[in-house]
């Protein structure tokens, strides 16, 4: 975009409290034309700031109140991370099949543990899509979910992962932001799927892959809109087809044979629209399809 470093002001580790409002106001007072809030709990504070600074664009990740706020300078954005979670579930399901084939587990003991942050829609849709991906490869797979009630709690995530393993889970995944769960899996020799980043640095013998976000797609788009003087969408969401989500490289030392080829096949199907993670085509209401009802 041709911006210089002094045109970008960054604030990190902003809590989900009044500090978020203070940070947003400070950025606006510094002359920022567009401000991004990147944690779910920042939204109400960004809404407050947006009402006070109508000439500044405020963009909030993972939120939902922009459309109902009536503020033309308030925007919500997220990517279709559920698509990447589905693909990472395929990786996990293939690993379970490999463990069944080599006698490490049986079909009846193919149980996944999921370390969730909060019982929010974002987390629920994420583990649902992950489970659908796993089930597409290993139909006998079951899954148990436990929450830490925090986005980032290293010890809490490690503790929940250990509890899930003690409860019979033979593979762990997560929607939480630290390396706590993968570290536990490495110690206990249990395969895992991480989140956000490649976990092989902390779990080289356990990590399979991680679904990951490419926020740069949105940041580039939104900032370009400001530069061009064009409107930013109130709600924005893109996925694999636009490069907004992906999975980290498959750890060949842990993954099942043939995983790379299957992942390519599934990703291409999502991109061309032949595979829908949440396929409602077979849903009916009183015998009528949703399409007919609409």
Language-model regions, residue ranges each:
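A residue-level marker of the well-folded mature domains of exported/periplasmic proteins
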Residues: 1-294
